């Protein structure tokens, strides 16, 4: 059973509830919706089997998108905290929220605790590439990190891809401003030899221009750089389609070309749409926690829950707990 924060996100609770119902209709999995009960019930519009698989737990407090984590963690009657408690107590196998990222992360660390050996939990998110997808870690959880943190990110990411995606030896690259060893700032220069020595599958530095070529399965970065990469990629993809619409597919000739290319363009747009991936796991806490985009609508919620189910069923958490995260151990 999974638990969902019904009040998190720009379009909560309506789009969250609709996405949950779509997921339940498709999979038959049980879901607990946590939030203001009266508001949730107003959105439970679908009939059929989904209603029998959805439980509601009331939570009077709401963590807003602008709220500071230090304030959010004090709200013990919020949908975030109550949902995480269900995971801690073993009632639910995973927690999903499209709410305030910082608040969810801080609450998860406080409520669930960190896995032994992990100093900084990190967000790992898929990015589309020419050959499929690559995974970026950290996508925004940690602005300031040390080399040992980046090492731990790489280890966690490899465990995730090996278990949830059955990639036997994931290729790991370190994001830098040049491919050669010795390029980068002080953090990158100190991290490179650690990954080179201790990470099987480490292929060296990767430049920004190669992220979407599919040369690596995992790209390691601090959360400041990683989040900029993520948001830049999202913005660029959206801008390209706006440009095509405004500058290319106009007039009779452009409209005809758009009609001919419609199927191909829809496939490309689908691959670039964050809603197709749905959510990103927070690795390093003692439980399965997925954080979705604040703009998530029903499609993103449904898909995010599907990925979270896959992660739970893979046994990822048990394997991560076995991991050796001590960078200084001989």
From Swiss-Prot:
Pfam families found in the cross-reference section: FA_synthesis (PF02504)
Domain of life where this protein originates: Bacteria
Biological-process GO terms, alphabetical: fatty acid biosynthetic process; phospholipid biosynthetic process
InterPro entries reported in the protein's UniProt record: FA_synthesis, Phospholipid_synth_PlsX-like
This protein's pathway: Lipid metabolism; phospholipid metabolism
Enzyme category, top tier: transferase
GO molecular function (one): phosphate:acyl-[acyl carrier protein] acyltransferase activity
Location(s) in or outside the cell: Cytoplasm
Coiled-coil intervals: none
Keywords recorded for this protein, A-Z: Cytoplasm, Lipid biosynthesis, Lipid metabolism, Phospholipid biosynthesis, Phospholipid metabolism, Transferase
Reaction catalysed by this enzyme: a fatty acyl-[ACP] + phosphate = an acyl phosphate + holo-[ACP]
EC numbers for this chain: 2.3.1.274
Cellular component terms (Gene Ontology): cytoplasm
Role description: Catalyzes the reversible formation of acyl-phosphate (acyl-PO(4)) from acyl-[acyl-carrier-protein] (acyl-ACP). This enzyme utilizes acyl-ACP as fatty acyl donor, but not acyl-CoA.
Family: Belongs to the PlsX family.
Quaternary organization: Homodimer. Probably interacts with PlsY.
NCBIfam families (alphabetical): plsX
Protein name according to UniProt: Phosphate acyltransferase
The organism of origin for this protein: Carboxydothermus hydrogenoformans (strain ATCC BAA-161 / DSM 6008 / Z-2901)
Species lineage: Bacteria, Bacillati, Bacillota, Clostridia, Thermoanaerobacterales
